[in-house]
Amino acid sequence: QFMVNTSPLAGTEGKFVTSRQLRDRLHKELLTNMALRVHDTANGDIFDVAGRGELHLGILLENMRREGYEMAVGRPRVVKRVIDGVECEPYEMLTVDVEEEHQGGVMESLGLRKGEMLDMVPDGRGRVRIEYKIPARGLIGFQGEFMNLTRGNGLMSHVFDEYAPVKEGGVAERRNGVLISQDDGEAVAYALWKLQDRGRMFVNPGEKLYEGMIIGIHSRD
């Protein structure tokens, strides 16, 4: 969902901030972006936007940001269908190529994301290729985690397979705690430096903050 920014920092990072401006821009995108779908909702400030995945929608968001549009974005969801009276979700065929020392962590993560391992082939030179069938919702946010688990040495590719009945239960959620701003103001270099040992920061010195804003991810769960 794309929506009007209602945070305490609304209106500070863009010149196009109203629902009408967002709607006009999204409908203009439909003229050239054939894989995009935009639907109005009961709330005039919120729009349902569907595309071909995180990368597709991420490119649209970045283009709009550079053009001066400011908005809030909801958590991505997969598009489900009802087939013969059964609720179904999209599944993908996933192939990962990793070093053997990272194999365990990757397999654990994909297991928590409802992945079903179909094949595993070592290459005899310290790497292994593993194939999975996994719900598309299990791949949301996995790219960054995969890069961390493999220290940037892993390869992954996935392609749509089919719509099949929804697997029960949710996929793995974020397992780490977060760092939260306790007051309004600007981020200070000294304060961020003192907090670095506690986790990875999302903000830089000089950025405006508000009370309750998530500013980093904690190193512990």
Model-found features: residue ranges?
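Accessory interaction regions appended to the cores of large information-processing enzymes
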Residues: 1-221
